[in-house]
């Protein structure tokens, strides 16, 4: 059996400018059968700190993504599997935010996910959590922040999970 590439996984989280850290992250390296069928899945999410449910939103997003991705049909592509899982998570978070009247921010979180399957890296991203590649001592940002600048002092997220029904 041919050996695959050597992969090292690292995760880092910090609160940043806010006191509270609403980040959640995780990785699943499954057994051999699932590894071949679905690959390795990783995710990081950062709940919108202006929401009282920020940490719940990020934890739910990461946990559900990692569990539900591996429960999708084996014949589905990575894109189909992740698309359906993230769509369901988005609808659920949006619905929970609306049903529970969680201020004006709802249950909203950024999300960056990566699936490594065979020799391909699939990236799924909404918001400003980032995925980087570190190779041969050089670091490269693989995602682009979804932020809109209003002025020098003000900007906002233009995309996030749970922010709307799409």
Identify the role of each PLM range:
Residues 1-166:
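PP2C/PPM-type serine/threonine phosphatase catalytic domain
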């Amino acid at each position: 059996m041919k050996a695959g590439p050597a992969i090292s996984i690292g995760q880092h989280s910090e609160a940043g400018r806010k006191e509270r850290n609403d980040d959640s992250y995780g990785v699943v390296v499954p057994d051999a059968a699932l590894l071949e069928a679905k690959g390795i899945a990783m995710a990081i999410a950062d709940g919108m700190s202006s929401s009282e449910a920020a940490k719940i939103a990020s934890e739910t997003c990461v946990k559900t993504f990692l569990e539900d991705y591996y429960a999708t049909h084996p014949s589905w592509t990575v894109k189909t599997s992740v698309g359906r899982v993230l769509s369901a998570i988005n609808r659920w978070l949006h619905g929970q935010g609306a049903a529970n009247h969680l201020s004006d921010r709802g249950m909203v979180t950024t999300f960056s996910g990566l699936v490594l399957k065979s020799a391909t890296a699939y990236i799924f991203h909404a918001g400003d959590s980032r995925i980087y590649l570190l190779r041969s001592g050089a670091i490269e940002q693989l995602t682009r922040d979804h932020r809109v600048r209003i002025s020098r002092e003000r900007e906002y997220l233009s995309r996030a999970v749970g922010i709307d029904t799409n």
